[in-house]
Amino acid sequence: MAKKIVAIIKLALPAGKANPAPPVGPALGQHGVNIMAFCKEYNGKTSDQVGMVIPVEISVFEDRSFTFVLKTPPASVLIRKAAGVERGSNEPNKKNVGSITQDQLREIAQTKMPDLNANDIEAAMKIVAGTARNMGISVKD
């Protein structure tokens, strides 16, 4: 029989740098999960993506064991990296802070495809382009 899930915890952590300090410690500790075991496993699986923020969904079971699923980095992080800017515009409709090309947009959409609710790459590109526009980053042809 399958183990019963007690909680699902969603966190966005820097790749390869999870440690027992907040936010990881308190989130897992209240469910009785072995925090160090999670940190070691997470850091091991994300060590090749250092510098990115990787969302993770942790399922905690009745016997305090856990499994986790890594998601793709947030679109905003990928867009900022592609545009080479530190942060998005504070007035997105008035002031542009950078731009990305169609090729970069397609690459980001392909990376995000598993987590996006889109049927094809064109729809995914529109979703990512909308995110970029809301950050004050234009998409060049």
Swiss-Prot record:
PTM per Swiss-Prot/TrEMBL: One or more lysine residues are methylated.
CDD domains, A to Z: Ribosomal_L11 (cd00349)
Pfam family for this entry, one: Ribosomal_L11_N
Gene3D superfamilies recorded: Ribosomal protein L11, C-terminal domain (1.10.10.250), Ribosomal protein L11/L12, N-terminal domain (3.30.1550.10)
Subunit structure: Part of the ribosomal stalk of the 50S ribosomal subunit. Interacts with L10 and the large rRNA to form the base of the stalk. L10 forms an elongated spine to which L12 dimers bind in a sequential fashion forming a multimeric L10(L12)X complex.
NCBIfam families named among the record's database cross-references: L11_bact
Function comment: Forms part of the ribosomal stalk which helps the ribosome interact with GTP-bound translation factors.
Family: Belongs to the universal ribosomal protein uL11 family.
Full protein name: Large ribosomal subunit protein uL11
Organism: Gloeothece citriformis (strain PCC 7424)
Phylogenetic classification of the source organism: Bacteria, Bacillati, Cyanobacteriota, Cyanophyceae, Oscillatoriophycideae
